[in-house]
UniProtKB/Swiss-Prot annotation:
PANTHER family: NADH DEHYDROGENASE SUBUNIT 1, NADH-UBIQUINONE OXIDOREDUCTASE CHAIN 1. This is NADH-ubiquinone oxidoreductase chain 1. Belongs to the complex I subunit 1 family. It is an enzyme of class 7 (translocase). GO terms for cellular component: mitochondrial inner membrane. It comes from Lemur catta (Ring-tailed lemur). Pfam families: NADHdh (PF00146). InterPro entries: NADH_UbQ_OxRdtase_su1/FPO (IPR001694), NADH_UbQ_OxRdtase_su1_CS (IPR018086). Core subunit of respiratory chain NADH dehydrogenase (Complex I) which is composed of 45 different subunits.
Length: 318
């Protein structure tokens, strides 16, 4: 039964990821006053499957100087970690109801750095290595703010379990009392998933293609799939944390519908940001975190810690 549930979780995620690639090309196309893919199938709807077929039937080339084992493992590890991160998410019921679901997500998203680092180092290319080192520095840096923002939300939630966030937000979304955290969280998720304007790891002008420059065919497709799966996962987590969906015990499908719509809107916002903003310079990227986000998130975390203590000093009102 567990394996059936696992496949029922993985298959829709992969389908959503496939159509996200199409949605991105369509949205970018319309924002640049062109059509986007419109040949393969009605309105280009079968384009993702054509792309997948083309990539997976090509011969996967491997550089002679590369480290074969790590070079081969890295793409598979990237996609596996991206899919494993979905396990504790309530949709409205998680695959495994973990007591420390948020810590699990934070830990698995940290592991994604290893696949990028291994791919950059094992490729034995200076462009790939620089891209990988950039990705590691960027991801580790922005995980500081993500962790502190999560800690602040947990103080309001009172539990590490994601399912309790549904109950916490029954009457009020957490985005309303903590909108500065929500803004910093959204920008940090852009950096965490290496998306524009923080896609320094794939800087075409200086690094050709970044950490995956030596990859082709199937292994390249696995990295591509991992990136887009992470985007949907981060937006799903944002919805769970800040935009708690309506939950009815007798009609759980209302939660799923509301959850899917909010996640879709956040994902479109990701694509809109990519179409609108130029890439940050690397020093600006680091200054944004260490000089702006980190002090702000620490101050807000202290505020949320001290608020219950201050409130307890107020005498009861008649």
């Amino acid at each position: 039964m567990f394996m059936i549930n696992l496949f029922l979780l993985i298959i829709p995620i992969l389908l959503a990821m496939a159509f996200l690639t199409l949605a991105e090309r369509k949205i970018l196309g319309y924002m640049q006053l062109r059509k986007g893919p419109n040949v393969v199938g009605p309105h280009g709807m079968i384009q993702p499957f054509a792309d997948a077929m083309k990539l997976f039937i090509k011969e996967p080339l491997r550089p002679l100087t590369s480290s074969s084992s790590l070079y081969t493992i890295a793409p598979t590890l990237a996609l596996t970690i991206a899919l494993v991160t979905w396990i504790p998410l309530p949709l409205p019921y998680p695959l495994i109801n973990m007591n420390m679901g948020l810590l699990f997500i934070l830990a698995t998203s940290s592991l994604a750095v290893y696949s990028i680092l291994w791919s950059g180092w094992a490729s034995n290319s200076k462009y790939a290595l620089i891209g990988a080192l950039r990705a590691v520095a960027q991801t580790i840096s922005y995980e500081f703010t993500l962790a502190i923002i999560l800690l602040s939300l947990l103080l309001m939630n009172g539990s590490f379990t994601l399912s309790t966030l549904i109950t916490t937000q029954e009457y009020l979304w957490l985005i309303i009392p903590s909108w500065p955290l929500a803004m910093m969280w959204f920008i940090s998720t852009l950096a965490e998933t290496n998306r524009a304007p923080f896609d320094l790891t794939e800087g075409e002008s200086e690094l050709v293609s970044g950490f995956n420059v030596e990859y082709a065919a199937g292994p390249f497709a696995l990295f591509f799939m991992a990136e887009y799966t992470n985007i949907i996962m981060m937006n799903a987590l944002t919805t769970t944390l800040f935009l708690g969906a309506l939950y009815n015990l007798h009609m759980p499908e209302t939660y799923t519908t509301s959850f899917a719509i909010k996640t879709l809107l956040l994902t479109i916002l990701f694509l809109w940001v990519r179409a609108s903003y130029p890439r940050f310079r690397y020093d600006q990227l680091m200054h944004l975190l260490w000089k702006n986000f980190l002090p702000l998130t620490l101050a807000l975390c202290m505020w949320y810690v001290s608020l219950p203590v201050l409130a307890s000093c107020i005498p009861p009102q008649a």
